């Protein structure tokens, strides 16, 4: 990138966000090579801590509720996903397939991380030919909705913007630093799945017959809007942000009081990111059963913004499951409720767990103050009670 363009990116980003957090005195980020050399050891340490226990699943008290996820027919074909996965695998070289395919019950499912430093398995987009990339995108398009596909691509593009804002550091950040693995063999009847893993974008996609589980999934970005550069104008997670705030503001004063865990937000609040598969997290916030029907529908619409990243027909199956448990759902909030506030919200039921969080600067600390701001968002979707990665379905198969 030319120096003039790079300079305009840094200035524009600082002006755009100065009303959220006063910029620190600009400093130089540490040389990329110094950090990259530590990545393998950092990854091994994260895995050693995060995978020390066998998978159980996220629970409210350490025990999973049984019978929530029966093996059944949904009537929604997964054939397009299977065909796309076969085409992707066929496009790879023999050596690429060896490092991309794992057994369906492999620990590889749980080896994902949002951070850019994590050393990932599989075949990376950066190492793919154009034909292989198209096959990979074909798998994503078959699995995701148009909304989910656009969000995924925009997150990848904003990772390029992040590289631009770090003095063209495309060793750590970039559009193509995302990896795909396939677990099992694509099948119409046997369990299998695939995973997309990279900075601010993780999709775990399990298939059994015509059932699909697309959790854990992670959607985020820093920045959330490209003020300039190659992908100027790209924006993500605004709908999830605005709809969350609108729902909170729809609550009565008493309901807001119940929903609010804390009014201030000095730091990061997400709890269910990488290597938190067995987190014990009790319900908190306002019980949805106490809300009006119109409020319940508004909350279901907010949930739909996340669920509908899944292909539309499968998303409807998931929404029905979530709706059936609406009276067992809780909504919690941290932070302010003004138009410019930073905040965290959590939607938690026996069958879905969603977190949205405005985070502190992580990869732009050389530009912004060390407080949460709207240009760094993390959102995580989980299936509690043992069915992340489709584990409960796999257990029953």
Region locations from a protein language model:
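Bacterial N-terminal signal peptides that target proteins for export
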Residues: 1-9
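Bacterial N-terminal signal peptides
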Residues: 8-18
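A cross-kingdom marker for long, charged
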Residues: 24-90, 99-145, 149-397
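Sec/Tat signal peptide C-region and signal peptidase I cleavage site
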Residues: 19-23
């Amino acid at each position: 990138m030319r120096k003039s363009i790079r300079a305009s990116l840094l200035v524009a980003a600082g002006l755009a966000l100065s009303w959220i957090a006063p910029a620190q005195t600009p400093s130089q980020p540490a040389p990329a090579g110094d950090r990259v050399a530590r990545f393998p050891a950092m990854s091994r340490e994260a895995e050693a801590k995060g995978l020390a226990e066998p998978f159980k699943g996220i629970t409210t008290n350490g025990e999973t509720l049984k019978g929530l996820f029966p093996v059944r027919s949904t009537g929604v074909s997964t054939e397009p996903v299977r065909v796309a996965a076969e085409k992707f695998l066929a496009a790879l070289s023999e050596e690429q397939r060896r490092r991309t395919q794992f057994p369906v019950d492999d620990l590889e499912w749980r080896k994902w991380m949002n951070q850019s430093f994590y050393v990932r398995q599989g075949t990376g987009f950066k190492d793919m030919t154009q034909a292989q990339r198209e096959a990979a995108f074909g798998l994503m398009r078959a699995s995701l909705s148009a909304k989910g596909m656009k969000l995924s691509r925009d997150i990848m593009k904003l990772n390029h913007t992040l590289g631009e804002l770090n003095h063209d550091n495309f060793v750590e950040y970039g559009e193509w630093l995302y990896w795909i693995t396939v677990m099992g063999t694509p099948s119409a009847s046997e369990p299998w799945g695939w995973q997309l893993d990279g900075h601010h974008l993780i999709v775990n996609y399990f298939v059994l017959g015509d059932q699909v589980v697309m959790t854990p999934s992670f959607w985020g970005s820093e920045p959330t809007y490209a003020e300039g550069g190659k992908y100027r104008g790209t924006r993500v997670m605004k709908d999830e942000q605005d709809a969350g705030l609108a729902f909170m503001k729809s609550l009565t004063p008493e309901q807001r009081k119940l929903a609010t865990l804390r009014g201030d937000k000095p730091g990061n609040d997400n709890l269910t990111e990488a290597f938190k598969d067995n987190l014990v997290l009790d319900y908190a916030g306002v019980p949805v059963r106490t809300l009006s029907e119109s409020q319940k529908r508004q909350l279901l619409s907010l949930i739909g913004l996340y669920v509908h990243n899944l292909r539309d027909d499968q998303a409807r199956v998931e929404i029905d499951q979530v709706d059936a448990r609406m009276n067992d759902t809780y909504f919690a909030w941290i932070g302010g409720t003004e138009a410019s506030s930073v905040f965290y919200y959590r939607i938690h039921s026996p069958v879905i767990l969603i977190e949205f969080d405005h985070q502190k600067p992580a990869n732009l600390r050389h530009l912004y103050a060390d407080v949460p701001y709207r240009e760094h968002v993390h959102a995580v979707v989980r299936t509690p009670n043992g069915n992340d990665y489709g584990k409960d379905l796999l257990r029953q198969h």
